[in-house]
Amino acid sequence: MTVRQLTTTDGTYTVSGEGFKPKGKLSYEGVEVTDAKMEQLQSDLSFRLSAACMSLCHNSQISKVDSRWQAIGDPTDSACAVLGWKINGDVRKFAQRHSRIHEFFFDTTRKRMSVIHEYEGERWVFSKGGAGGFLPITDWKILDGEIVPIEPEDIEKASIANKEMASQAMRVLAL
């Protein structure tokens, strides 16, 4: 399993790479994201938190053994961790810099996994799971670096993106 797309409030990024090898690039509208552009994206709170969620909200171990990358853990978690690695670098080192305080394991009632981490001097809850598990609890969004109330059209836009990706036989997760 490999992450192929990352859709944020700013648009959809395609992701290159194979399997659990944490090598690959993001592209936006067909143009590869350069290191300079990635630095700019990392200054955007929404993108940065999405990338942090990929790097922190999992229990997988990604490692290179005998020149081959492999993952120990849930394949979905592992695919997310690999995307986190492509954006933030080694997820093990990233997690060491942002200590985990608590975990709420995935369960079929909540339909999501959540973790609390120290991140950028504050405690943040990072969650990932099926989009339906987020709808009842989604009240806020990040717009231009500010946390603002979510609007009905935002939910509709996310629902359309979800259906579009699902129609391409993609497993869709919400962050």
Stretch-by-stretch model annotation:
Residues 1-175:
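Conserved cytosolic headpiece of P-type ATPases
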